[in-house]
Amino acid sequence: MIISEKKQIKMLSNAEMELIHLGACRLLSRVGVKVTHEVIAEKLISQGALRKGERITIPANMVENALEKTAKTIQFDAPDPAYSFTLNAVENRVKFGPGGQALYIVHPAAGGWGRRPAGTDDLKQILVLCNRLKNVDFITRPVECDVPEDRMDLEKARIFRQCCSKPMNLANLIKVEHLDRVLEMIGDPAHVSFIISLISSPLVLDNSAGDKFIALVEKNLPVSISCCPQGGSTAPFSEVGELLQLHAELLFGFVLGNVIRPGARLLYRGIPVTSNLYTDGSPRWCQPESIRRVALAAQLCRFYNLPCCGTAGVSDEAEPSAQVISEKVLSWVYEMAAGAQYINSALGMLEQVLSVSYQQYVIDDILLGIVKEKFGENGSLKPSQLALSAATAALSRFGVAVDEKMEAELAARIRHIENAMEPYNEEYIGEQLNLIEKAVNKTSSTVFMKTARKGLREGYLYRGDRIDAPLDLSDATGRLESILGQVN
């Protein structure tokens, strides 16, 4: 669907985004990226990068050249041509697909929910299910096959070829030497795309990912460059600092991609989440401050007319619940309103990225239909009003009587998403640049955690109440049984 200009949100001004961009370019030219992959280092140096010990620094002109050259339109073809679509960086068209690399399946058990390891049969069943869900536009690998690692790529390709008629995102490539065989098994390379986590935060090139990135870009395959720093552990706890680091890490990928192949077909996938510094440091994927930061990354990407791979709907809850519905709906609304186009991991995800649920895929498909209806309605609702309306409608759809207390909690989450807590100015950006430089030269997690105390005191991490109410899942269960029953 197309998101109208009226339904978009601009949480950063153009001037603020320009400051973040200039700061990220300073970070690349001053601190650079640790690169021990000699082939990649030489490729970058040949185009104007500089060596600084083990780090490669990137001058601003290389960044600007990459942004100018990189493909602005990417075609995603499908085995069934009816599902093919084009992503154009200047359009506000949004598509949704599942994703993740979940280890577990959450399933009904003894009046509640159980959890078991995911495997090959689950990959088949989930692909079949997503192939039939109305609001799934493309399918990203949700779980891995339970086969030896040296067979994973080929088994995954075989199952996708057998079960998927929509555009396929195979996500990661386990063995780069399998790429030619994978493409042969798929049948048409135009049907597939990939995701690469190229940089380990803060600012270190992953050598294995670098090999795979070269192979994929040389074949002109679409690649989402994914970066998921955690504010407070692998990036500054500051929103401004985390965006600076994230943007620099992703820009490095665009520079490298266009050195390998000018006009490379790359998507910007920024997932700047926070760490739960109140407990175990785990990522807070779908809490208000993370929803805000991920939406800001999408807005920053679209400001530079780059194809945007978004991430939304990755609930922190372990099983289907009213809280899950609330987290997912707010996450989708703000990622859509901020300009994300190719929204990955949007369905089925629970317990951060550890689990998926067959029931949750169907629930999410229904919920996405509600959210799309809200975006499609006439009128001039602000994103905050649209988000509240969508969340209450979604909860009501599954039998939750939304009361004043629930509405107040939803409104508080929305305010936390929309309200900035830090200045976007040159002085503050300079402080964050110095912090990142200090972190890359020392133990980064220690540096970032020590400086997180101020943000904790000021409430960067949202601490509200869970939305707790029983759900009526009879319709979702019936739909699931109908779909899987028809194909089994």
What function would you assign to each model-found segment?
Residues 1-4, 45-48, 52, 230, ...:
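Short acidic (Asp/Glu) and glycine-rich catalytic loops that position anionic groups and cofactors
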Residues 40-46, 270-276, 312-320, 350-354, ...:
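A glycine-rich phosphate-binding loop feature that marks nucleotide/adenosyl-phosphate handling sites
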